[in-house]
């Protein structure tokens, strides 16, 4: 459930994960400021594709510009971090207002993407790629 912060404003919290990245997201009503690790959103996320991935829960629920979002993200690369931010924003929106649940769940934003890099096996070049086979 949403908690209220010092000023009495509703505060939604969510933790998102993707690959090896973890994002802690805090949402409250405001002007639409988005900060990632104390940096502006446009400075931290420079690729347009990753921006749309990270903000897709807000676009889906038509809440872009209604909330101030503070994100602390660590681990992994920029693609995994964008996915973790998307997951965290979706969970925080659900925590703030439960009427978003059906919209977010139907688009699978509340589900954690469990795909990770497969480990390399011994006797092989990569996880699945084998060395060249010679009959003779």
UniProtKB/Swiss-Prot annotation:
| GO terms for MF | RNA binding; structural constituent of ribosome
Q: Could you list this entry's UniProt keywords, alphabetically sorted.
A: Ribonucleoprotein, Ribosomal protein
Biological process terms from the Gene Ontology for this record are: translation
- In terms of domain of life, where is this protein from? Bacteria
Q: Read off the Pfam families from this record.
A: Ribosomal_S9
Entry-linked InterPro entries: Ribosomal_Su5_D2-typ_SF, Ribosomal_uS9, Ribosomal_uS9_bac/plastid, Ribosomal_uS9_CS, Ribsml_uS5_D2-typ_fold_subgr
- What GO CC annotations are associated with the protein? cytosolic small ribosomal subunit
- Family designation: Belongs to the universal ribosomal protein uS9 family.
Question: This protein is called what?
Answer: Small ribosomal subunit protein uS9
